[in-house]
Amino acid sequence: MGTFGTESPLRLQVSSCLKTLSTSRDSGEIVHALRTLMRCLDDGEFTRIHHTHALQVLVSAQSSHWFSRSHDEDEEEMKKLWGEIIIRGPAEQTLLTLLDTISSTGESEALDRCVSALEMFLSAARLQVLLWSRCEVSGASADSPQLTETVIGHLAALPSITSNHLHTNTPDIFLPQQYYPLLAASILDTLEKTCHALRAGRDCSLGFVSQVLGKVCIQGYSSQMFETLGPRLSFVTREDALYQRVTQKLMENVPERCTESVITGLIRSLSGAAAVSRLMGNLVLTNKKAQFVLTHKLILQQYQHPTRLLKSVLGYLAVDSSRRPLLKQVLRSVCQVWCNSSAVKHTCVEQQLYVSKALLLCVALLDDSEIQELRQEMLQCMLGGVQCRLDSNVERIRRMGMVVGECLSHRLDTPGSQLKFQYGADEEIGELKSLMESLAVNDDEEEQPDASNSLQPEPKVEAPVSSQSVASDPGNGSESELDSDDDLTPYDMSADQEKKKSAPPRYVRDCLEGLMSSDDAERFELSLQVAETLLRKNVKATQEVSVQFSKVLLHLEDRYNTALFLSLRQNAMVALTVTDIKPVVDYWTTEFYALNYSLRQRLDILEVLALAAQELSEPVTNKHTGAEPITAVTPLGQSDDITHWRQIVDKRIQSKTRRISKGVTQPVKAVPNRYAPVAGFFFFPLFRSYDRPQTTFDLLGGDHLVLGRLLHTLGLLMHLAVNAPVVSQMGRALLDFVWAVRFHTDQMVRRGVMFAVCAVFLSMPSENLLTELGDDLMETRAWLADVAESDCDSDCRSLAVQSLMLMDKNLKSQLQIPDMET
């Protein structure tokens, strides 16, 4: 290059060519200028100094008409030469120029040709050339950090840059679904070239590639990248130690702010702890951010990941002896969280399940010596965690505590004191128990043999001695065969019933005495079975002994293991309530807060009140219709077939019947609501003593389960009283009660609170909302919005959203605010 004041021949030549391209309309001159620029591509000075300006002139020349006004042969040659300059030029400068031109150019032929040029650039594998040029140690030594950051940003955000300007006209290759796998394939090619260069004794740098990978992942496209990178890297690093080191170096050079997104995407794409160990090496020991992500964030702060990721992370910590101290550190942290009662109350069930899986996996990966070292901490974790979970009102949390407690006590191998619980099995419990099985961390999951095949014992071949021995038995001769009863048709005894010694009671008082008898089991069972029918048929007799009968049923115990005892008892209690409403309901609501009742009895009272109110609110139907005349005697086995053919014949008649006109549809006959006049008897007495703690019952204290059920029952009673005159007073009283417990720590109680609020907004007339609740509506709305956004329980959040929608709907209808058109 010449000194200041003099111009080099190359610069003069390039300036002449660019002037010709900008101003000339002669196709021959244009072709000659393009050929000259083609020859200059091999000159290092041209690529360093003049290529960017030349490319800008070429792109801007597209707005002129030298393509369309030339002869066909010249036009084809010009397009070919122009494409060669795009492809053979420095990839980095070409990419930046094309993207900047697309971003600054309006709709025109020039924009279309720039888009075509960028498509050509990507299809010609120029991304690989760009990345490899940055890996060579001498390739990027003179570039400024600002230029490097610009190139990385354009590489990572190419889909966003193009789609923001092209909108629906964006080519498919620019979309994330195609571009990022293409970029990932280019990274794989670059890593391959790096391995070859290192084997040849040349130095390489992976810093630029690591920054590109981190930039893409932090923008949210890690899954698209590692769908291509993960499986391929896992495969090639099994036998190639150099490739392992190159991949580990790639991960080490990822910027700290991008570490989490890169590590998470990588682990999700791999299929085993061994693959993670090959690709990451001891990154968890040398990088503090990676250590925080792997030992804390992915395990304790996030819970959306699949179980496979937990297995990979914890297996990665366990597969190498230098990383096993971190596994014990993780176990200690998980134990502290799992036995923390505050965490049980303030975290969602899904996160507690995730932490429980992590705890079981950690324990399964420890050897016996490590178990003995951590035995005391694990024992405290087991006892504290099981206790606080058994105190929960959420069934999933209780069962989770039982399963984990059993697994931990079995692993600790405490002689004579292993925990054992009774619970129903489901898929979640089966998954938790399966985590305690021995985990193979030295092989990838896809390389392990099928467990179902390897664990099955070989079938035992047994000689058919039984049939032969029977045939050769000397005791079974011809005489025994002649005397056999096998040819006789057995008598059908399926419909036989056991003959009862006692007859079922026919009067209400006899039924009551039968339930009170403690020495005759058969009489007790018969009395309980017919109790509901007798109570509903004999109204007068029932009303005479309704309170006494209610007392007997409330204290009734299943002394004889009667079939369907709970349902028969509950049905009888409901029948008493709907038959003699006021005295029985007064008895239920009074005894609910009385002393010396178990929680089960109090819950039974709430269930009976809810079922009775539901029955009273439904229309009365004639359940006992007269017997239909018998037209023919039908064998038992043919009744279903005849009914089936009757339906077919009726359908055929209906389909072939022609109707000239249809009569007026009869309106639904109005029937009185039996619940509306007595709704107050069910509802208001339940508020009588809720804030008065007793020796055996503290509703606002430790008896969270009853409080949650009470709130659900009050909400149901409120909803069934819709259109009743007393519904506004009920809504006001229920909201006052809810307001006192709206910040309760128990999830069951908060669900009941949300259910009750929904019931209020569903049942109260909209015109009464502003009148009765005007002062508290805004505060209630702010509270519901906070619950919908930040509550740890998904059901509470869902109910809060529904309550907000109902409130807004009622207020809009009352204030007559039209919906905004979108």
Curated annotation (Swiss-Prot):
Coiled coil: none
Annotated keywords: Cytoplasm, Membrane, Nucleus
Localization per record: Cytoplasm; Membrane; Nucleus
Primary site of residence: cytoplasm
GO BP: any one term: 'de novo' cotranslational protein folding
Cystine connections: none
A Pfam family matched in the record: Telomere_reg-2
GO CC annotations, alphabetized: cytosol; membrane; nucleus
GO molecular function, one term: Hsp90 protein binding
Disordered as annotated region, ranges: 442-504
Gene3D superfamilies assigned to the protein according to its UniProt record, in alphabetical order: Telomere length regulation protein 2, C-terminal domain (1.25.40.720)
Top-rank lineage group of the source organism: Eukaryota
Biased composition (Polar residues): 465-477
Compositional bias per record (Acidic residues), positions renumbered to this chain: 480-489
Ribonucleoprotein recorded as keyword: no
PANTHER family: TELOMERE LENGTH REGULATION PROTEIN TEL2 FAMILY MEMBER, TELOMERE LENGTH REGULATION PROTEIN TEL2 HOMOLOG
Biological role stated in the UniProt entry: Regulator of the DNA damage response (DDR). Part of the TTT complex that is required to stabilize protein levels of the phosphatidylinositol 3-kinase-related protein kinase (PIKK) family proteins. Promotes assembly, stabilizes and maintains the activity of TORC complexes, which regulate cell growth and survival in response to nutrient and hormonal signals. May be involved in telomere length regulation.
Protein family (similarity comment): Belongs to the TEL2 family.
Designated name of the protein: Telomere length regulation protein TEL2 homolog
Organism lineage string: Eukaryota, Metazoa, Chordata, Craniata, Vertebrata
Gene: telo2
